């Protein structure tokens, strides 16, 4: 309507959304309306590197003027080959996407059953709300040291003060037992740290 350029960061979505893993823009039928799409070869694709997709002129401009790109080197051939195979696989297979959705739903349901507050959203990323930077870091450390569960604490300035959280992303390779172990650990730590429970 206004002729604006649109830039979409799909790093959390490629491989996971859309019938062929093209991301939210594919899932919603908007890919042809986006000026520039940024994605990653990490996360769902399990490799390293990233990309931008747009017109030839815009991509050429970025190659010439993006300070983060100008002095970089190309991906090693083995990484590029692995990424290509991964992309091809996820374009054809829905099994991984469906398995992840199942595990995301399981974790959300178990958190709800235990009264552990998390932000409701349509994403596969589940932010468990701690709302205290010291406790957020402490919980992250204890989960790693005592339970072997790695989770990154998300504190200010990444999020506003008072909204500190642990951010969980279940994968299709996490078993039901893995998710139950996580929820059991969070239940124990919630009680030990006297954190507020969600209101039903």
Where are these regions (language model features)?
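Residue-level detector of family-conserved "landmark" positions at structurally sensitive sites
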Residues: 8-9, 121, 153-154, 200
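Hydrophobic side chains in well-ordered alpha-helices
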Residues: 61-62, 139, 178, 182
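N-terminal glycine-rich, Lys/His-bearing helix-loop that initiates the first secondary-structure elements
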Residues: 3, 133, 198-200
């Amino acid at each position: 309507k206004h002729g604006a350029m649109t830039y979409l960061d799909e790093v959390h979505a490629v491989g996971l959304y859309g019938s062929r893993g093209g991301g939210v823009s594919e899932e919603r039928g908007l890919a042809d309306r986006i000026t520039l799409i940024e994605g990653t070869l990490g996360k769902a694709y399990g490799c390293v590197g990233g990309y931008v997709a747009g017109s030839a002129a815009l991509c050429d401009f970025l190659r010439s003027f993006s300070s983060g790109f100008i002095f970089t080197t190309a991906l090693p051939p083995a990484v590029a080959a692995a990424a290509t195979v991964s992309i091809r696989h996820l374009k054809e297979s829905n099994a991984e996407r469906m398995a992840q959705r199942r595990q995301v739903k399981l974790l959300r349901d178990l958190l709800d059953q235990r009264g552990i507050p998390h932000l409701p959203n349509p994403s596969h990323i589940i932010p468990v709300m701690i709302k205290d930077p010291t406790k957020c870091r402490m919980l992250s450390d204890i989960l790693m040291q005592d339970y072997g569960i790695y989770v990154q604490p998300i504190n200010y300035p990444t999020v506003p003060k008072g909204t500190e959280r642990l951010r969980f992303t279940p994968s299709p390779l996490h078993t039901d037992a893995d998710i139950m172990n996580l929820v059991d650990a969070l239940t124990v730590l919630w009680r030990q740290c006297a954190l507020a429970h969600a209101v039903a």
